[in-house]
From Swiss-Prot:
Membrane topology classification: Multi-pass membrane protein
Stored InterPro entries: DUF1656
Pfam families: DUF1656
Alphabetical list of NCBIfam families matching this protein: PRK11594.1 (NF008615)
Protein name (database record): Protein AaeX
One cellular component (GO) term of this entry: plasma membrane
Organism: Yersinia enterocolitica serotype O:8 / biotype 1B (strain NCTC 13174 / 8081)
Gene name per UniProt: aaeX
Family listed: Belongs to the AaeX family.
Length: 67
């Protein structure tokens, strides 16, 4: 159960998890931009799978932060 209220933007109702998804997506893009020049993707077997797991971990951490 989230402590955030339901957001209403231009008459559209968004659940509280929507803010957590957007924050984790923004943090994912920043972190990916930082990791690409370091060359860590050369050691990753499947970059798309790595990105999905990274986003999942970030979403979990942010959702635990807000709950």
């Amino acid at each position: 159960m989230s402590l955030l209220p339901v957001m209403v933007i231009f008459g559209l109702s968004f659940p509280p998890i929507f803010l957590e998804l957007i924050l984790s997506l923004a943090l994912f893009f920043v972190l990916r931009r930082v990791l690409q020049p370091t060359g860590i993707y050369e050691f990753v077997w499947h970059p798309a799978l790595f990105n999905t797991a990274l986003y999942g971990c970030l979403f979990y951490l942010i959702s635990r932060l807000f709950s």
